[in-house]
Curated annotation (Swiss-Prot):
Protein name: pH-response transcription factor pacC/RIM101
Organism: Trichophyton rubrum
Encoding gene (name): pacC
GO BP annotations listed: positive regulation of transcription by RNA polymerase II
Main localization (coarse): cytoplasm
Record's subcellular location: Cytoplasm; Nucleus
Length: 758
């Protein structure tokens, strides 16, 4: 039994030993067959070429069936020996790899100049391309040889020549949009691109046509994963960088920023030099018009900052394919130079004051606002619960309504207690003057006793008791309660109102108001300048008019002028003119001024262009003030102490060089001795040479003589040239002979000129 079992164990061992022997014999037979094929005639070798071509087509079909993630055994692989044949004329050598085939053609068929076998004509098939250098022919051979050592780091595509790879890399410049999407996984390709379809295995095990399955993981560096290690970037071209994440439309160019920067600097310089009047609305609007539409370097309102960082960059290359971070890239940042007209703290403070004055001109000047077509004067600034405005900046002065309460109080205290039936139909009884004054001064009184005839309180077309309440310092909260009590009455002339009302004519030279106005007339009143104001007369007071002649004819008696405590000194011209003409001042309600006429126009008559221009000016001034104040708060200015030290050093250097230059200039011009004599060209040069030769000692007596006769230059300038010659001879004719000759020549010339003139 043991022998039988041992025999059974020996039989498998013998069979295992026989199998390698049989395999070796089969390999030997195959090798002999290959050697026999090589020894066969050329006719049989030509017949084997189509067979090899069929094998190559079969290998290509197998590569198309397999997924792209798995690299197939290419014909140029070392495992497929003899698959590449040299097609050079007269050569049929087989090479295992493309590298070996390339080396074979370059060394054997092209040759070298050193070995005296250089061939510059391509003999591959029927090419017959001729070059002038060996490098050119070797580069041309790569076209025929399936050798592609240069691979793209983006898509992995291989190229035969480095110049072909360079051209291909440029096509990936548009692929940078793949990294611009902020969504997660934006760099991935969710679906295979067009043309990435092949033959795969379906669920039933059969071949089916459909999308090729992706063989790479997350994230995909490229379309397929090569099995060989990645090569380093080709040294023939450098890294390529692309800007991502920034839209070019939002990047302001340096030229446009510089243009706005220079315009703003020039504007500040004109402000410092007072090139335009900041109190004139027309001048301010015209000057601000140059700044509209420019990218000003302001730090708010969406303006472009002075410092603009460079966009983030994405590098290409690195050895892993796809897009990669290129590490820290040296950015080239730029900034604009500091403004020359806005450097020191004093400059900033002065500019802020000028801007505030301009802002006050735009806001507070009623005539300018009405001329701009914005609204009626004061419509953009309303006191009380109706406080609404069309702008974002507050007026600079709004507390002047209790500056002069004594003026209207005096007028109210001296008026009579009678009210006419045309003004109030509900009350006709007399009121004592003391109660009127008390009601005027009382802060709890909701309405005044009567409407005073003060034309200095408002220059609008109507008169409202609210004006009196505001002039006495009453709270604006009482205004709405008094507004609804008075209706809007038709306007009458000043003389009718004067004759019908019970107001005495000794209080004011202006005609008392005979009508009431709307609720908003008081809101149109201006509180600027610290004093009461009224509109400018619509005509020139120096020229007579038909209306003034009619007023003079109908005047009953002369009226005294207003007291200086009632109106401001700015209206003294109108008061003096009233005294000269001896006529009562016309009420603005009877003959409205052009400003009032413009203000009385409705919203439909406004000019949209003027209103828009006014709003833009207001916003621009506010932005400029915010910019200046921000620089003051941040300390963004040059220290004045350091600037003074540098100025002192420059002054000291200039003082050292000043004596020599001063003496040379005096000697050249001769201003110290002969200020009235004109010397030009060679005469001035000769005078300077003579003064230098005579020396300091000879000049001292001349200076003494000049001090003794201080009136000599003046007399010489007012007398004739003959008197100048005599005085020059008396002063020292031996000192300056050249100047004497010049004087003689000038005298002769002047005499000739006088004769010619006669």
């Amino acid at each position: 039994m043991q022998s039988a079992s041992s025999l059974q164990q020996q039989q498998p061992q013998q069979q295992q030993q026989q199998q390698p022997q049989q395999q070796g014999q089969q390999q030997g037979q195959q090798a002999q067959q290959q050697q026999g094929q090589q020894q066969q005639p050329a006719s049989q070798t030509v017949q084997s070429v189509p067979v090899q071509a069929n094998l190559q087509h079969a290998a290509a079909a197998a590569a198309a069936v397999a997924p792209p993630g798995v690299q197939q055994v290419a014909p140029n692989s070392p495992s497929a020996p003899g698959s590449l044949e040299c097609q050079w004329q007269g050569c049929q050598e087989l090479c295992p790899t493309p590298e070996a085939l390339y080396e074979h053609v370059c060394e054997r068929h092209v040759g070298r100049k050193s070995t005296n076998n250089l061939n510059l004509t391509c003999g591959w098939s029927n090419c017959r391309t001729t070059t002038v250098k060996r490098d050119h022919i070797t580069s041309h051979i790569r076209v025929h040889v399936p050798l592609k050592p240069h691979k793209c780091d983006f898509c992995g595509k291989a190229f035969k020549r480095p110049q072909d790879l360079k051209k291909h890399v440029k096509t990936h410049a548009d692929d940078s949009v793949l990294m611009r999407s902020p969504e997660p996984g934006a760099g991935q390709r969710q679906q295979p691109p067009a043309g990435m379809f092949g033959v795969g295995l379906g669920p039933d095990g059969k071949r089916s046509l459909g999308p090729v399955p992706q063989a790479y993981g997350h994230p995909p560096p490229q379309y397929y994963q090569p099995q060989h290690p990645q090569q380093q970037p080709n040294p023939s071209y450098g890294n390529v960088y692309y800007a991502v994440g920034h839209d070019a439309a939002h990047q302001a160019s340096y030229e446009s920023k510089k243009r706005g920067y220079d315009a703003l600097n020039e504007f500040f310089g004109d402000l410092k030099r007072r090139q335009f009047d900041p109190t004139s609305y027309a001048a301010v609007g015209q000057r601000l018009l140059n700044l509209h539409g420019l990218p000003l370097p302001l730090t708010h309102a969406g303006a472009v900052p002075e410092y603009q960082p460079m966009p983030a960059m994405v590098g290409v290359g690195g050895g892993h394919g796809g897009y990669q971070s290129a590490g820290p890239i040296p950015t080239q940042s730029y900034h604009l130079p500091p403004m020359g007209n806005l450097r020191t703290k004093a400059d900033l403070m002065n500019i802020d004051q000028f801007l505030e004055q301009m802002q006050s001109t735009v806001y507070e000047s009623d005539e300018n606002v009405a001329a701009a077509g914005v609204a009626q004067p004061g419509a953009h600034y309303v006191q009380g619960p109706l406080s609404y405005r069309t702008t974002n900046s507050p007026p600079t002065h709004h507390q002047s309504h209790h500056q002069h309460p004594h003026a209207t109080a005096t007028a109210a205290a001296t008026t009579t207690a009678a009210t006419t039936a045309s003004m109030m139909s509900t009350s006709a009884a007399a009121t004592p003057a003391s109660s009127i004054s008390a009601a005027s001064r009382s802060p709890h009184a909701s309405t005044p006793a009567l409407t005073p005839p003060s034309s200095a309180q408002s220059y609008t077309s109507g008169r409202s008791p609210i004006s009196l309440a505001s002039s006495h310092g009453m709270s604006p909260s009482h205004h709405p309660s008094t507004a609804g009590m008075y209706p809007t009455l038709p306007a009458t002339t000043g003389q009718d109102s004067l004759s019908s009302s019970g107001y005495p004519t000794t209080v004011s030279s202006a005609a008392p108001p005979s009508t009431l106005s709307s609720v908003f007339d008081d809101d149109r009143r201006r509180y600027t300048g610290g004093m009461l104001q009224r509109s400018r007369p619509d005509i020139d007071l120096s020229t007579p008019s038909i209306k003034r002649d009619d007023a003079d004819a109908t005047a009953g008696k002369d009226e005294p002028k207003l007291s200086s405590s009632v109106i401001d000194p700015a209206l003294s011209r109108a008061s003096v003119d009233m005294d000269e003409d001896a006529a009562p001042h016309r009420s603005p309600s009877s003959t409205p001024t052009p400003t009032a006429t413009t203000a009385a126009a409705g919203p439909d008559d406004r000019q949209p262009a003027g209103e828009q221009q006014w709003v833009e000016n207001v916003r621009l001034l506010q932005r400029l003030r915010d910019y200046v104040l921000e620089r003051l708060n941040n300390g963004d200015y040059v220290d004045e102490d350091k600037q003074d030290d540098s100025d002192k050093e420059e002054d000291a250097k200039s003082d050292k060089a000043s004596p020599e230059s001063a003496s040379a200039s005096d000697a050249a011009t001769g201003a110290g001795e002969y200020p009235s004599i004109k010397m030009h060209g060679m005469e001035a040069i000769a005078a300077a040479a003579v003064a230098h030769e005579e020396g300091r000692d000879d000049q001292m007596p001349r200076d003494d003589e000049d001090q003794e006769n201080p009136s000599t230059p003046t007399a010489r300038s007012t007398t004739t040239m003959l008197d100048a010659e005599e005085e020059a001879k008396q002063a020292g004719e031996n000192l300056y002979p050249v100047l004497k000759m010049a004087v003689d020549d000038d005298g002769a010339d002047t005499d000739g000129d006088e004769k010619m003139g006669q």
